[in-house]
Amino acid sequence: MADLDDIKDGKDFGIGTPQTNTPYTLKGCGALDWGMQSRLARIFNPKSNRTVMLAFDHGYFQGPTTGLERIDLSIAPLFAETDVLMCTRGILRSTVPPATNKPVVLRASGGNSILGELSNECVAVAMEDALRLNVCAVAAQVYIGSEFEHQSINNIIKLVDAGNRYGIPTLAVTGVGKEMARDARYFSLASRIAAEMGAQVVKTYFVEEGFEKVTASCPVPIVIAGGKKLPEHEALEMCFRAIDQGASGVDMGRNIFQSSAPLAMLKAVKKVVHENMSAREAFQFWQEEKQGEGQ
């Protein structure tokens, strides 16, 4: 215990200087509990209120797809440069070194595969296990308009309720099935429903027309999915336009780890997201980094 012989009375109480409260300015998150805000502040850069997430959770329904055959060889070299890791608990425990010390968004839905109905998912992780893994958020798909729409919405509700008990945010991912639309009207509907159910963050797709309506009508931060592999200049253009139209970040997988220069691509995406670099400048940056890395 402290030495009781040398206790000095306090003198500097700042009389006349009111105590100020620092507001948490991430969209729609100002009234969340301290622990949840703290976790979100690790995901979203407090200076830009934006994030670059590296998604490599595809194996939970796709198996060892191109670029993810060996996480330890292809993805681990990218850990240091990304803001956030998005993966499953199996990969986290088996392949991600704890000393990586990056915030994790944990894939918490599953039970489906590319061989069956994609929307037929369940909650695949108990919140207590997410706590053991020290993650900053959990993620699940929501399939609006699908055969298992109600089930997927209920998955989000379960995660939100459990997350609220422990201070862990839920990221709802607007899944798109084989026959489902990919337009602003659909993604506005899906994103708004996810937010109304209590998701603190929504991941959705960028669309060429009306994306600003998707972000404006969603009361919480939206991060865009990278989607299918695009040429690097197109992927960077998509990033720039999404940020310019209100997105709070990107959650990219294939457009990074399937790039001919993944590390350079990740750095270029961060330039766009956090520094508002234009797509043209970012593509030039990628080319220079690619040459510098000998890729």
UniProtKB/Swiss-Prot annotation:
PANTHER family: 3-HYDROXY-5-PHOSPHONOOXYPENTANE-2,4-DIONE THIOLASE (PTHR47916:SF1), FRUCTOSE-BISPHOSPHATE ALDOLASE CLASS 1 (PTHR47916). It comes from Enterobacter sp. (strain 638). This is 3-hydroxy-5-phosphonooxypentane-2,4-dione thiolase. Involved in the degradation of phospho-AI-2, thereby terminating induction of the lsr operon and closing the AI-2 signaling cycle. Catalyzes the transfer of an acetyl moiety from 3-hydroxy-5-phosphonooxypentane-2,4-dione to CoA to form glycerone phosphate and acetyl-CoA. It catalyses: dihydroxyacetone phosphate + acetyl-CoA = 3-hydroxy-2,4-dioxopentyl phosphate + CoA. GO terms for cellular component: cytoplasm. Keywords: Cytoplasm, Schiff base, Transferase. The gene is lsrF. It is found in: Cytoplasm.
